[in-house]
């Protein structure tokens, strides 16, 4: 049985006071939810403050990125070990915005994933196709390449620390959402590829999240699909009531 994960990616939003106010609002909404793993990913500068705010509740902390070296002359970077020290249990790696704006490649994603696993973090590994790639009927080709390259060199045991997040780039922040059926087809393909690269048993246990304009209004239909194990939520994770409603999609 794969435990669902609802993860909120705050992107470049919420200073310290805003983050703490959000957590204070969210906790009462989700504190009785025991059958869903809840993760929030604030900006680096508020990680420690948010960790203190969620210390006694069922919410876990993620960063939005990391570097592949643990320390050194790498100005502006944050290492996986530093994220653990700040209280993180998870880290998002390979988000489409990192790929689009900051030169992230499959190679750098792979290096970051290996470093994060070594530090003990659970990785939310993002993959997904652009609109042009989908219209050129290259969705499966793109997903397979991203999975093969991103997970290259990982041992089977490492997959216990991997959660895959499928984010069709054309549906991020656009208000467009893949239909439940489109999302399920992509998720089933991702699970198939993981089975081919590792084992069918690993593929059956790995959790695959959907990310692409997830809202309270569409989360239940997505979560009813057999290969969708959760959501990586963007805009709707910035308001406690909407994120709480997504977390409590079973209610």
Curated annotation (Swiss-Prot):
Name one cellular component (GO) term. Answer: cytosol
Q: Which PROSITE patterns match?
A: TIM_1 (PS00171), TIM_2 (PS51440)
Q: In which pathway does it act?
A: Carbohydrate biosynthesis; gluconeogenesis; Carbohydrate degradation; glycolysis; D-glyceraldehyde 3-phosphate from glycerone phosphate: step 1/1
The family database entries (InterPro entries) matched by this protein are listed as:
Aldolase_TIM, TIM_sf, TrioseP_Isoase_bac/euk, Triosephosphate_isomerase, Triosephosphate_isomerase_AS
**Reaction catalysed by this chain?**
D-glyceraldehyde 3-phosphate = dihydroxyacetone phosphate
Locate the active site: 95 (electrophile), 167 (proton acceptor)
Give the Pfam families listed for this entry. TIM
Annotated compartments: Cytoplasm
Which enzyme class? isomerase
Q: Which UniProt keywords apply?
A: Cytoplasm, Gluconeogenesis, Glycolysis, Isomerase
Principal localisation: cytoplasm
Q: Name one GO molecular function term.
A: triose-phosphate isomerase activity
**Gene3D superfamilies from the xrefs?**
Aldolase class I
Alphabetically, which GO biological process terms does the record hold?
Answer: gluconeogenesis; glyceraldehyde-3-phosphate biosynthetic process; glycerol catabolic process; glycolytic process
Cited function: Involved in the gluconeogenesis. Catalyzes stereospecifically the conversion of dihydroxyacetone phosphate (DHAP) to D-glyceraldehyde-3-phosphate (G3P).
For this chain, the family text in UniProt reads: Belongs to the triosephosphate isomerase family.
Q: What is this protein called?
A: Triosephosphate isomerase
The beginning of the lineage is:
Bacteria, Pseudomonadati, Thermodesulfobacteriota, Desulfuromonadia, Geobacterales
